[in-house]
Regions:
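Conserved beta-strand segments of alpha/beta enzyme cores
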Residues: 114-116, 183, 213-215
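Conserved SGNH/GDSL esterase-like catalytic core that processes O-acyl groups on lipids
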Residues: 74-159
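N-terminal secretory targeting modules
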Residues: 1-79, 255-257
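Alpha-helical scaffolding within the catalytic cores
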Residues: 64-68, 127-138, 168-174
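Catalytic His-Asp segment of secreted/periplasmic serine-dependent ester chemistry enzymes
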Residues: 193-257
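Active-site segments of SGNH/GDSL-like serine hydrolases
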Residues: 149-153, 174-203
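Charged helix-capping and loop-helix junction motifs
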Residues: 132, 161-171, 199-203
Length: 257
């Protein structure tokens, strides 16, 4: 009898050990699977984070009009041409186009924004632009964006305001035809201080610009009053201080700075 009981106890113990072993093994497998699954999730999240960080590091850090333009084109590069009179040049320092582009170089993480400045000097008037092949010259550069100064000061005393607008419009049409898709930003020539006829020509430009296929950026409000203009304009053209002021005003629109 004792042997029978002892044998039964041994069998129960063995069965219990077997059940415990299988329970333990099943539990270990479950934990292992959960660990592998979590590791997979963590790795996936790390990959997502890594991809996002890489995207952010390559992201476009330019605001304003240019940032919107790059976003709309899904582009990370652009070529810009600044075209105008001697008001876009500065013999004594950096011109306002150079100062604007310098801000882009300092503030952009990855976009390749290249540019050039094409000046027609102080004598060429708007009615000569097509005849002298300037539309062709711009087209050769194949810009994505053309920043066009109105040449109003060059036209002052040579052409009526309405004629200036007509020639400017024809020039814009010619450029747009040769460079399909180019974005054109039109800016008025700088103020010059006390004058009679010239401000009226700018007024006509302001009135007619909305009818042109351009984005018009009037920066005149950023300039000081006529009696304070001497430090910013000399012989009708911007001084270094004037170029800095113009660059600051245009940059607020162009790159949001």
């Amino acid at each position: 009898m004792k042997n029978t009981v002892f044998t039964a106890l041994i069998m129960v113990s063995v069965v219990g050990m077997v059940i415990a072993h299988f329970y333990y093994q099943n539990r270990v497998n479950t934990i292992a699977k959960e660990a592998i699954s979590q590791a997979s999730v963590d790795t996936h999240n790390q990959e997502k984070t890594s991809t996002k960080a890489e995207h952010d590091s390559e992201g476009i850090e330019i605001g304003g009009w240019l940032g919107d333009f790059l976003d709309s084109q899904d582009a990370d590069s652009a070529y810009i041409v600044f075209f105008g009179s001697s008001s876009i040049e500065n013999e004594n320092g950096k011109s306002w186009p150079e100062l604007v582009m310098e801000q882009i170089d300092n503030g952009a993480a990855s976009p390749a924004i290249d540019y050039e400045v094409i000046s027609v000097g102080s004598d060429t008037t708007s009615d000569q632009l097509l005849a002298e092949g300037f539309a062709d010259k711009i087209a050769e550069s194949e810009p994505d964006v053309l920043v066009l100064e109105s040449l109003t000061l060059n036209d002052n005393g040579n052409l009526a305001a309405s004629d200036s607008i007509a020639h400017l419009s024809a020039f814009i049409d010619a450029v747009s035809e040769q460079i399909p898709g180019v974005e054109i930003i039109l800016v008025p020539t700088n103020p010059i201080g006390p004058a009679t006829v010239y401000p009226g020509q700018i007024d006509v430009l302001n009135e007619q610009a909305p009818s042109l296929p351009v984005t018009y950026v009037d920066h005149w409000d950023a300039w000081p009053a006529e009696e304070e203009m001497a430090a910013y304009v000399e012989s009708g053209r911007p001084t270094s201080e004037g170029h800095e002021l113009w660059a600051s005003a245009f940059s607020q629109f162009f790159i949001g700075e």
